């Protein structure tokens, strides 16, 4: 396990009350958790969706902790065969949580095993082959499936409709991100001023994972150049040297906009063409870069392709 992974785990909140941001989702989740505990039943199946780094995995861990049950984690691409999932389901304890990250990448054959398990807590297994094959129903303990996806549109309707709770995670406000990095700084022993937290928070692309990563790198600059103190000026200088601008755009964000404007007149241009021009994968652009650029008003997605906005021209000091 790497040092960064250990650090990430150490700063994850363990309780729902310690989770910062996503106020409406958090308030609703408190009701769902308390109701499940009160009734002594497995919580209804939950689907979290939203961009990477917003806290889907953390929320699954919090749910298990709050309910006092085990959390079994896997991911869609790992579940290659229906038997893989069946083995996991039959080993779950009563009311345990099964967390499936990237659930949209689960094969259809595996997905179909989930249907009776989610609805009736039963597995339909085929024993044998050919004319002698027969279907056997096996009971599994009542459990809660927690799915996480960055691309809810790729989930099949039958699977999506079996989730009783579907919650979207939004980008975080700069104020919430400042609180998150301040909390992380206390845990890891970083000397972060209130102004330094605000500076990091407003450049973190609305994403806690990025905010904590920037804090670690800014702390390096503070250790070498500022006696360990992370002030607003130090944070601004460090982030500038890392090519993270005041809007949170990094080198790749700006390259994407510059290619769109300078090579294609601001668009519209197809995503595949744009990906080739930027030497980047289509999925990476769609999942990592586009959502934030659209959220900030630098990019528009149209039926004819991607278009740079007037705000993008102004941000890059280019004439539109």
Curated annotation (Swiss-Prot):
It is found in: Cytoplasm. Keywords: ATP-binding, Cytoplasm, DNA damage, DNA recombination, DNA repair, DNA-binding, Hydrolase, Nucleotide-binding. Belongs to the RuvB family. HAMAP family: DNA_HJ_migration_RuvB. GO terms for molecular function: ATP binding; ATP hydrolysis activity; four-way junction DNA binding; four-way junction helicase activity. Residues 173-243 are annotated as: Small ATPAse domain (RuvB-S). Homohexamer. Forms an RuvA(8)-RuvB(12)-Holliday junction (HJ) complex. HJ DNA is sandwiched between 2 RuvA tetramers; dsDNA enters through RuvA and exits via RuvB. An RuvB hexamer assembles on each DNA strand where it exits the tetramer. Each RuvB hexamer is contacted by two RuvA subunits (via domain III) on 2 adjacent RuvB subunits; this complex drives branch migration. In the full resolvosome a probable DNA-RuvA(4)-RuvB(12)-RuvC(2) complex forms which resolves the HJ. It catalyses: ATP + H2O = ADP + phosphate + H(+). This is Holliday junction branch migration complex subunit RuvB. It is an enzyme of class 3 (hydrolase). GO terms for biological process: DNA recombination; DNA repair. Residues 246-320 are annotated as: Head domain (RuvB-H). DNA binds at residues 301, 306. Its main location: cytoplasm.
């Amino acid at each position: 396990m790497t040092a960064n992974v250990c650090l990430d785990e150490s700063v994850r909140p363990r309780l729902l009350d310690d989770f910062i941001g996503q106020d409406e989702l958090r308030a609703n989740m408190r009701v769902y958790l308390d109701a499940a505990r009160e009734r002594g039943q497995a919580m209804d199946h939950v689907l979290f969706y939203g961009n990477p780094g917003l806290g889907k995995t953390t929320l699954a861990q919090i749910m298990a902790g709050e309910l006092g049950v085990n959390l079994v984690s896997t991911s869609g691409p790992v579940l290659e065969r229906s038997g893989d999932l069946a083995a996991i389901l039959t080993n779950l304890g009563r009311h345990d949580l099964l967390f499936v990250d990237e659930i949209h990448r689960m094969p259809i054959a595996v997905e179909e095993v989930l249907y009776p398990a989610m609805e009736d807590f039963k597995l339909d297994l085929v024993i044998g082959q050919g004319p002698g094959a027969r279907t056997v129903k096996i009971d599994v303990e009542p459990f809660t499936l927690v799915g996480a996806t960055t691309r809810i549109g790729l989930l099949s309707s039958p699977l999506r409709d079996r989730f009783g709770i579907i919650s979207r995670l939004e980008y975080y406000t700069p104020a919430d991100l400042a609180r998150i990095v301040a909390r992380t700084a206390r845990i890891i022993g970083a000397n972060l001023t209130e102004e330094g937290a605000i500076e990091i928070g407003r450049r973190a692309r609305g994403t806690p994972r990025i905010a904590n990563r920037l804090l670690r790198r800014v702390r390096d600059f503070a250790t070498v150049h500022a006696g360990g103190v992370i002030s607003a000026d130090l944070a601004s200088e460090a982030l500038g040297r890392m090519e993270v601008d005041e809007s949170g755009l990094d080198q790749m964000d700006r390259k994407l906009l510059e290619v769109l404007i300078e090579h294609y007149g601001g668009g519209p241009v197809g995503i595949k063409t744009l990906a080739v021009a930027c030497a980047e994968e289509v999925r990476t652009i769609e999942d990592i870069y586009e959502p934030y650029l659209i959220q900030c008003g630098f990019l528009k997605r149209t039926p004819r392709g991607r278009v740079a906005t007037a705000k993008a021209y102004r941000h890059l000091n280019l004439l539109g």
